[in-house]
């Protein structure tokens, strides 16, 4: 698979992380309200540094940058399984940027990248069952709900096992829209 380092949408640039992104990454990764629906966090400063060190895989993990300001507002990624021609997409945005369509925009670009550039046949995503914002992002991008994984992961903020809603889209479904 030939990975791209940078992807662009109308309002966003998805680019590799740098260590200079520390403050932005820690602003969402270290905020309990922001990571409530995640299986990780809230991060300590050391955990955020480790995250940034791990995020230098071209074409898989991206910093989400507003074109208008150059500000890093989140992270996203696509994680291919080349053996099965499938991939999983995920994202997190700083809560100050929720409900502005950025999630839908970046997820749409990750899905496009997966099908058109990486040649995947199926893309999945999942979210905490109570994370209605992520449901909407997936559904707006043509993904359909496939099921519910009961007590799928430990939510560190709420300190409880959380169900996960599983979504997917096939290449033929993507191409038909």
Task: Show where each model-derived region lies.
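Conserved GNAT-fold acetyl-CoA-binding loop/helix
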Residues: 33-54
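Secondary-structure boundary motif
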Residues: 54-57, 116
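Acyl-donor (CoA/ACP) binding surface of acyl/acetyltransferases
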Residues: 1-35, 61, 65-177
